[in-house]
């Protein structure tokens, strides 16, 4: 197996002591991932399809140029009017992952076994992502028993974050099949009343939830320490 990959970049980290009630942790990474194969079976698939072995490096599937995170933690301690209260906010940013622009093909019907690229390997860039998570907690002392209540909110702003795309469009909800003659024939065959019905029917079939990260999620809980 002659495949290889390299990953190079820079990482920056800033951590503060607790200043008053607040502590900050910030991180940033600049990364370049390139090589001749993104996973262990890349060479096998090329040989199976009768292709030529790569002679130059390309961006890898997991090549992500920028990632950053910021944690802001606030704690009141055991003094003051709002004692034993805490809040933690986590912000995360990631630039888009790579994909290879390809000819349109159906994502739900059989036929074509693999994509047919129309541009350089992994030359397309998926949308970037931004997420924020929040945790708030408060502890009450009841007869030397610590009762803590907490609320965790994942994806606070309910951002729609794309995790995978179709190689034709670079979008999570368009595989390009309806732009082909075969796709138009399918729409005409399954349309009831209007062509729009057939298009909506097909698009509903390719709207995979796995192409998106989770929406806002709220958890409430109680913790007892004794």
Question: Which ranges hold each PLM region?
Answer:
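Intrinsic disorder/low-complexity segments enriched in polar/small residues
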Residues: 9, 117-120, 196, 220
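Extracellular/periplasm-exposed beta-strand and loop segments of Gram-negative cell-envelope proteins
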Residues: 1-5, 33-46, 52-63, 100-107, ...
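Hydrophobic, lipid-facing positions within transmembrane beta-strands of outer-membrane proteins
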Residues: 8-12, 56, 66-72, 130-136, ...
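Gram-negative outer-membrane beta-barrel transporters
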Residues: 1-98
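Weak global preference for isoleucine
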Residues: 10, 24, 46, 70-72, ...
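C-terminal beta-signal and adjacent terminal beta-strands/loops
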Residues: 79-113, 127-131, 138-226
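Short amphipathic alpha-helical surface micro-motifs
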Residues: 51-52, 68-71, 115, 132-134, ...
């Amino acid at each position: 197996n002659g495949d290889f990959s390299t990953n190079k970049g820079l990482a920056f980290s800033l951590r503060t002591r607790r200043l008053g009630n607040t502590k900050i942790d910030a991180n940033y990474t600049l990364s370049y991932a390139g090589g001749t194969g993104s996973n262990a079976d890349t060479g096998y698939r090329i040989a199976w399809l009768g292709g030529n072995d790569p002679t130059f490096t390309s961006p890898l599937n997991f090549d992500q140029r920028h990632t950053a995170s910021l944690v802001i933690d606030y704690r009141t301690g055991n003094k003051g009017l709002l004692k034993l209260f805490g809040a933690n906010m986590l912000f995360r940013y990631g630039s888009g992952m790579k994909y290879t622009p390809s000819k349109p093909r159906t994502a739900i019907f059989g036929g074509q076994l693999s994509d047919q690229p129309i541009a350089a390997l992994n030359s397309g860039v998926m949308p970037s992502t931004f997420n924020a998570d929040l945790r708030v907690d408060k502890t009450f002392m009841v007869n030397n028993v610590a009762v803590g209540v907490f609320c965790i909110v994942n994806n606070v702003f309910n951002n729609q974050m794309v995790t995978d795309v179709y190689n034709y469009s670079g979008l999570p909800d368009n595989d390009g099949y309806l732009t082909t003659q075969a796709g138009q024939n399918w729409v005409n065959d399954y349309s009831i009343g209007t062509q729009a019905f057939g298009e909506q029917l097909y698009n509903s079939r390719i709207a995979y939830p796995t192409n998106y990260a989770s929406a806002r999620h709220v958890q409430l809980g109680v913790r007892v320490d004794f």
